[in-house]
């Protein structure tokens, strides 16, 4: 077993048992990197027999980079698993096969994930497939310095795995809404810093770059200048990306993320008016 799993947490007593159930028993080691839980997160981790480590919160990217730099991982490969995610049996078998072979040319792999929203799997809306770079050789990848929606930068070739993981935050809509309210604040701050030349992200954005760099260019250079972004996001997700085929749940999912887009717009406008973070 040559895979180490890192699970960042804070107050994840509802989600963590499901993530651990999908990770314990086959990985070389599992680390729960906690940033100050006041619920039963620690108790759940210790009962499962995994290593619980506290580290004060530094931000999404810095927290995970600290774990990669300081935790005594024994695996040659590392998988980053959020507490509200589950590694499916099919994905587990594929991860083990890659780690066992250890002769692949790739140093990192994108993993597809599917979202559960209001107890229904989202199959369209532009949220499936949803590729995340989560599996990589130890020492060959780090997260870019960014406040939110950070990407991993890999030294070497990158591949794609066939099987999926599940994303399902079981803490309910009240928490989900609060989380996205926080994310929209971070997104607005990031856009404001880019406009003012204050951004610290290590991943560049360019129309002529790779897929992520091109998407970043659209998101940071073109998208903020458009009017009615919330409307166009809803139209894109619900009509052009066939969210309508996800039924009533798809409608609510698209409308929720359109409102999230509008929150970013309002908060960025406020920052522009004040002229400071």
Q: Which residue stretches match the model-derived regions?
A:
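Cell-envelope/extracellular polymer assembly enzymes that use nucleotide-activated donors
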Residues: 2-4
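Short, well-formed alpha-helical segments that are part of the catalytic scaffolds
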Residues: 6-25
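Acidic helix N-cap motif at the loop->helix transition within catalytic regions
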Residues: 14-18, 39-48, 90-91
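A conserved acidic beta->alpha catalytic loop
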Residues: 22, 26, 34-43, 57, ...
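Short, structured coil segments at secondary-structure junctions
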Residues: 26, 47-49, 154
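Conserved beta-strand segments of alpha/beta enzyme cores
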Residues: 29, 51, 157-159
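Conserved donor nucleotide-binding strand/loop of the catalytic core
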Residues: 42-70, 74, 101
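Catalytic-site signature of metal-activated, phosphate-bearing donor transferases
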Residues: 62-68, 75, 79, 88-272
């Amino acid at each position: 077993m040559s895979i180490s799993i890192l699970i960042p947490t804070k107050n994840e007593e509802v989600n963590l048992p499901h993530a651990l159930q999908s990770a314990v028993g086959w990985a070389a080691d599992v680390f729960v990197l906690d940033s100050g839980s006041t619920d039963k997160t620690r108790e759940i981790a210790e009962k499962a027999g995994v290593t619980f480590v506290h580290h004060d919160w530094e931000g999404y990217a810095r927290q995970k980079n600290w774990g990669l730099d300081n935790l005594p991982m024994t695996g040659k490969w590392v998988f980053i698993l959020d507490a509200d995610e589950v590694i499916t049996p099919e994905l587990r078998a594929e991860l083990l096969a890659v780690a066992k072979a250890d002769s692949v040319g790739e140093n990192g792999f994108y993993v597809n994930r599917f979202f559960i929203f209001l107890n229904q799997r989202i199959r369209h809306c532009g949220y499936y497939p949803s590729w995340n770079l989560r599996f990589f050789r130890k020492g060959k990848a780090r997260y870019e310095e960014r406040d939110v929606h950070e990407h991993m930068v890999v030294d070497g070739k990158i591949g794609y795995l066939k099987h999926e993981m599940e994303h399902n935050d079981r803490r309910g809509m009240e928490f989900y809404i609060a989380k996205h309210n926080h994310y929209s604040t971070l997104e607005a701050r990031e856009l404001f810093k880019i406009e003012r030349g204050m951004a610290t992200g290590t991943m560049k954005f360019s129309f002529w770059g790779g897929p992520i760099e091109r998407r970043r260019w659209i998101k940071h250079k073109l998208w903020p200048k458009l009017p009615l972004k919330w409307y166009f996001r809803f139209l894109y997700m619900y009509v052009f990306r066939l969210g309508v085929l996800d039924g009533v749940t798809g409608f609510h999912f698209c409308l929720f993320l359109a409102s999230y887009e509008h929150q970013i717009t309002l908060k960025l406008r406020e920052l522009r008016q004040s002229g400071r973070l």
